Curated annotation (Swiss-Prot):
Any one Gene Ontology molecular-function term assigned to this protein's record: structural constituent of ribosome
Domain of life: Eukaryota
Organism annotation: Arabidopsis thaliana
Alphabetical list of InterPro entries matching this protein: Rib_uL2_dom2, Ribosomal_eL14, Ribosomal_eL14_dom, Translation_prot_SH3-like_sf
One BP term from GO: translation
Name of the protein in question: Large ribosomal subunit protein eL14y
Alphabetical keyword list: Ribonucleoprotein, Ribosomal protein
Family the entry assigns: Belongs to the eukaryotic ribosomal protein eL14 family.
Pfam family, one: Ribosomal_L14e
Gene Ontology terms: cellular component: cytosol; cytosolic large ribosomal subunit; cytosolic ribosome; endoplasmic reticulum; nucleolus; plant-type vacuole; plasmodesma; vacuole
Keyword Ribonucleoprotein assigned: yes
Gene this protein is translated from: RPL14B
Length: 134
């Protein structure tokens, strides 16, 4: 199995750190071996170092350095947001954000639910063991 996420025009990437942390951006041009020109509907087009980007599996069909309107249309046509939210990586980040926003009482309720679930699983396992040995 080879590497499939290449730096290419139209590749959607996730920003790892910095002021745009967590945003999905599209590579619209490659400046040199270390930097790319990236753009997104809710931000200005900027140069970004490849070390700040994590390439995703999503690729949209765009020309080199498209206008903002063309980029937005291409992203909507490719359904980038839904593809990202349905991917395991996107779901994991959504869960992390949701957990980070929990307050103490919410964490307490989750702890009680986990204890209750573990108790039910333990009871069912004991029933199955009893059936096997009987």
């Amino acid at each position: 199995m080879g590497f499939k996420r290449y730096v290419e025009i139209g590749r959607v990437a996730l920003v790892n750190y910095g002021e745009d942390h967590g945003k999905l951006v599209v590579i619209v041009d490659v400046v040199d071996q270390n930097r790319a020109l990236v753009d997104a509907p809710d931000m200005e087009r900027i140069q970004m170092n490849f070390k700040r980007l994590s390439l995703t599996d999503i690729v949209i069909d765009i020309n080199r350095v498209p206008k903002k309107k063309a980029l937005i249309e291409a992203m909507e046509k490719a359904d980038v947001k839904n593809k990202w939210e349905k991917s395991s990586w996107g779901r994991k980040l959504i869960v992390q954000k949701r957990r980070a926003n929990l307050n103490d009482f919410d964490r307490f309720k989750i702890m009680l639910a986990k204890i209750k679930k573990a108790g039910v699983v333990r009871q069912e396992l004991a029933k199955l063991k009893k059936e096997i040995t009987a």
